Amino acid sequence: MKLSATTLTAASLIGYSTIVSALPYAADIDTGCTTTAHGSHQHKRAVAVTYVYETVTVDKNGQTVTPTSTEASSTVASTTTLISESSVTKSSSKVASSSESTEQIATTSSSAQTTLTSSETSTSESSVPISTSGSASTSSAASSATGSIYGDLADFSGPYEKFEDGTIPCGQFPSGQGVIPISWLDEGGWSGVENTDTSTGGSCKEGSYCSYACQPGMSKTQWPSDQPSDGRSIGGLLCKDGYLYRSNTDTDYLCEWGVDAAYVVSELSNDVAICRTDYPGTENMVIPTYVQAGDSLPLTVVDQDTYYTWQGLKTSAQYYVNNAGISVEDACVWGSSSSGVGNWAPLNFGAGSSDGVAYLSLIPNPNNGNALNFNVKIVAADDSSTVNGECIYENGSFSGGSDGCTVSVTAGKAKFVLYN
């Protein structure tokens, strides 16, 4: 998805921290196709699509903040959902009636480009290891890159080896030190490739920015400070003279740990694919937090005070939560209206931290009104943790109303509990 730089602000939050979350929802797309590269289906550019950012702002106590309030507060956050025009039409009365708790930013895109990967790509003969124990549990996918989707680092430990510019060929995926391959996209392990002609997909080639995923709990560190003026975001390593170079030389490592504030804990008998958007970058929802039955994994909570900003606004980590029992290869892709996966998954997570307070959200996906086949609640991880507010998704309904819910974590950690 490409967002233009023309932004209309319907309301403003003076004195509060406004945070933009990257949640790319599919809209009506011109069916004319220009290219198909390595399993990534590209549609025509210059498609006019209207999107709306719907922002719910809460303070550190998990309470909704009225945008016009004069209350002094230095620690608040906004959970922002990007909604397609068709969804806004259906819910416009609701948005208008809840103006005290939402901020709307209407953005017109003149170059909406979507990369779609069909679920059929999961049927190739190669395999990608997904086992947390490093044993023989595998899932089918196609790629020359190797490595587990759970990474090689212990939680919140490392990385230890610095990345050396100009030493790894563009055709070689740099697995390790937290970097994990996305094998099912058929792009050599990369989570997305942005080319010099503004197209996306294919191999990592000269002049392209080649984006990558990091293991659960981590985020990539690489994106150029000079971003496009048309609202697109660029992220990843730069392919130059046949070799990979950092686009952000302020750090020596390709992955960094987020704030140690949230875990996903499964009480289910089936695995669940939670797919983060690749942002900054193509916004493919392909970065996996694949929680196996009865297991737990850290959920990346980005430090919004130091992480990527979009046109001066802080950004948070955003996730698509798929129904239990769907493989990671079939779930962490661009889906279709009938698939119920990827950008059509029933639920979104949001996670970010500012001024030492973590904000965690459950957010409805307007693309899919069906209930998830399990429930989710955000609760304190232990007695020493402090979680303000209530946030429960049960049988398709939210404790905070139809717009979802947000909690703040002021001490310790929270857990997203998946249960029946």
From Swiss-Prot:
Gene Ontology CC: one annotated term: cell surface
Glycosylation positions in this chain: 395
Disordered, as annotated region: 89-145
A GO BP annotation: division septum assembly
Induction statement: Expression is decreased during transition to slow growing or stationary phases.
Signal peptide annotation: 1-24
Deletion consequences: Leads to increased resistance to zymolyase treatment.
The keyword Transcription is annotated on this UniProt entry: no
Keywords: Carbohydrate metabolism, Cell cycle, Cell division, Cell wall, Cell wall biogenesis/degradation, Glycoprotein, Glycosidase, Hydrolase, Polysaccharide degradation, Secreted, Septation, Signal
Domain of life: Eukaryota
Predominant cellular place of this UniProt entry's protein: secreted
Entry GO MF terms: glucosidase activity
Locations listed in the record: Secreted, Cell wall
Enzyme Commission identifier(s): 3.2.1.-
PTM: Glycosylated.
Family of the protein in this entry: Belongs to the SUN family.
Role played: Involved in the remodeling of the cell wall during the various phases of yeast culture development and under various environmental conditions and plays a role in septation.
Note: Present with 24700 molecules/cell in log phase SD medium.
Name of this chain's protein: Probable secreted beta-glucosidase SUN4
Provenance organism: Saccharomyces cerevisiae (strain ATCC 204508 / S288c)
